[in-house]
């Protein structure tokens, strides 16, 4: 498989156009319709997601991405993390937790705000495995 980086979204934290039809942003111009920030990296046999924007389901479907090995979070803002629950189908498909990488602070906040994704809680099976980035790191396919 070819190595590839796909920008899935490059809009602001509100996306573009805004839900209110923000003035000065002509939504008839295709260049003004942008989903929130995230990216996908296809490297050798790995499928790596950078951030889980609120638009992640649509972004994956539009780009025909059907597999996922890991997620890297740049920081813990809603526009980077709100799509975290959309990772469940990849856990169900692969029957293994998805490793998520981020700084100590980002992982701490993700675990606090999305406890059900990291710990078994009544009605929810943990789907994610936290990986704190200290300096350099590498991602390997889980077998």
Question: What spans do the regions from the language model cover?
Answer:
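Binuclear metal-dependent hydrolase catalytic cores
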Residues: 1-143
């Amino acid at each position: 498989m070819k190595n590839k980086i796909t920008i899935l979204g490059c809009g602001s934290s509100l996306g573009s156009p805004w839900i209110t039809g923000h003035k000065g942003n002509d939504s008839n111009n295709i260049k003004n319709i942008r989903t929130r920030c995230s990216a996908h990296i296809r490297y050798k046999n790995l499928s790596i997601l950078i951030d889980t924007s609120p638009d992640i389901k649509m972004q994956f479907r539009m780009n025909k991405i059907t597999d996922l090995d890991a997620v890297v979070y740049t920081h813990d803002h809603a526009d980077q993390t709100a799509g975290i629950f959309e990772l469940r189908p990849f856990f169900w498909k692969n029957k293994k937790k998805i490793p998520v990488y981020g700084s100590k602070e980002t992982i701490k906040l993700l675990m606090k705000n999305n406890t059900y994704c990291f710990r078994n809680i009544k009605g929810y099976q943990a789907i994610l495995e936290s990986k704190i980035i200290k300096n350099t790191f590498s991602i390997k396919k889980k077998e």
